[in-house]
Amino acid sequence: MRAYKQTDHQVAFGWFGGWSGEGAFMKSSLAGIPDSVDIVSIWDNGTNLSEAQRKDMAFCQNMKGTKIVYCSIIGSVGDKLTPQNILDNWEEMGYNSEQEAINAFWEYPSDESNIQAVEVSIRKYAKAIIDTLNLYGYDGFDIDYEPVAGPYTGNIVDKDEHLFFFIDELGKYLGPKSGTGRLLVIDGEPQRITTKPEIGTYFDYFIIQAYKPGSDSNLDKRLIDGKVWGPGLVETFGGVMSEELITKRTIMTENFEATDAAMDGGYPYTDRYGNSMKSLEGMARWQPRNGFRKGGVGTYHMEAEFGTSPEYKNIRRAIQIMNPSSHSLLKN
């Protein structure tokens, strides 16, 4: 399985929620995820890890070759990493607001026209994220970037120039430019990074929340020419990356937060030939209109389909469709 994951293939991805790493019920453990899943992004409970969580993650990384990445919404410098004593005691420390105290700790300037100081502060924050990933042993970072859908705003994401400082610093340690083999991925709305498209070259994967897409046409538009939820990825990044590379780095995902959808494999979907199926299968079968191979497919709250028979039946089937093998990944 570890050798398979080193090959050039369409990957299986999932956001995992409710992680505890313990208990007889494997729904809350990474060890219960199919061996053939390539990348798991921890959606919550991803810091202050217990001994059980550390062992659970190490088992999947070392025995299965699964990449475990940490997911976080990105907004402003200091989010989730500002020391608690500053958040609790900013008034006693003489600051006029919590935000003023946060900015002081991270040396973020009150005058944003001082772009050099802005850059230094943003890079300091990015390095703190790297330190956190290293502390817990993660294989990479999943940036939840949703400036419109959230909307998640802040002094990093509100300006593409600021976002570039952040991504460029992360890119020294993660992603295709780093040479480390560690992952830097972005989910949500990467297609909206229109004023500095070179940011796109720093990511291993663009992970698109193509929830309830309904058809091949919807996925084609999200990838190529847009008009579904902003521009297409190729529209945004095509000036700095080849269409083939963009396509090979694109993972389409379905929302399994609703248990009935998870158990059923998603929502109604019709391919370009008129065949009807559920959406996760449709994504797996989808061959992009441009003729290039996609990066893969995934699910949000992947753990919600643990209760299928066999467990994780739908993602197993999607993997088998994308990467046919001589033996089925579905258990008998």
Predicted regions and their residues:
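Secreted glycan hydrolases and related glycan-binding modules that recognize and/or cleave
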Residues: 1-332
